[in-house]
Amino acid sequence: MKFFKNKIVWASPVIAFVIIFIFSLTAVPTVQPSPKDLPIAVVNADEGFKAPDQEKMNAGEKVLENIREKSGTSVKWVQVASVEEMKKGMDGQEYYAGLVIPKDFSAKQASLQTAEPEAAQMEVVVNQGMNTAASTMAGQMLNGVVDQLNQSIRTQVMDGMVNQGATSLSMEQAEVLADPIEKKVTNVHKPGENSANGNSPVSLFQPLWMASLGSAALIFFLVRKGTVSSRKQSLLVKAGQAAVGVVIALVVGFGLSWVASDIVGIHIPDYMDTAIFLAITSYSFYLMISAVLAILGSKGLPVFGLMLFFGLPLLTLAPEMLPTFYQDWIYPWLPMRFMVEGLREMFFFDHGLVWNGPLESLTAIGVVSLIVLLLSGFIHGAHCIESEKFAFDNGKTT
């Protein structure tokens, strides 16, 4: 039978396996993600303490040395000068969490072996708006650090009192030694309710991407069906293609904001700012897809399908939690990350619609794509002229 002689029939199992292999790779980053160089701020305001006839001690410095030795490569400890500097860094999404050692930490630790002990206090600050999974993990790490310090200090104090010949503890000492370090946990930039557990920026990506991809592909096929006979006409068609994209982008931006807010129920702090940002994002993606299709033709469509399947799992994770290959070679090339980063700043950091890094990147993508799209019209128009000249010369020769 001719059916079994067709090479595609015998190649179909191999093609099926390749498809399975490619799409299985999208799940790799989400299987037991582990952090690497997760930035956590540390403020050591400890002024130290000097007992009579003894050298000055600084327990805060010892704490820093201890946590740096035990954390390995999972955490990048960044020591900052003050709480204000740490909060400024969190506003700029530089740290997932922070640990504050107070100025009287050494003095209160030294008081634990006296008749009037006082518990020291450490503050754990969690920057929830950056990334839910990463900030939660960073907060758990810092809580573990404080718990280990509590146990270590309790053991040291008890051993010291035994060595001094103490046989019993006062009620005050027993109460303080139960928790020699009081832990205060503060959450900043909280996503709040109706935020998909902090993933609302990622939730908006898929519908916007599909709308931009579908509309760009539709206009591309409509343009391809038409015929152009001059360079000027080809340029006008490409300019019209870009102009139609403006209308589509406005519909996508304002429509998605309305659907997300009023139908899905996602909390959007500022409807107008969000709608304009989504419109700019959609237009940038529309131009990018149109430019690629103008160069590669319909062969370029699978590229954007793969970007969707590979990008969606990566966008839910912090870059520091991705495998090295994905972190260095996949994530930086995902244009949709600028959309998620921009929405995160608007939703959780109260930045509003401002000229920042994500908006700059999206604008740059759109401008470059528009230039490529118009150049493709110029080149295509030149081909049309050459084809007409060739046909005319052949007819004249004949």
Model-derived regions, located:
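Juxtamembrane loop-helix boundary motifs flanking transmembrane segments in multi-pass membrane proteins
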Residues: 78, 82, 175, 183, ...
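Extracytoplasmic/periplasmic domains immediately adjacent to an N-terminal transmembrane anchor
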Residues: 2-196, 389-398
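Membrane-spanning alpha-helical segments of multipass transporters and channels
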Residues: 263-398
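Internal alpha-helical transmembrane segments of multi-pass membrane proteins, especially GPCRs
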Residues: 10, 239-243, 360, 364
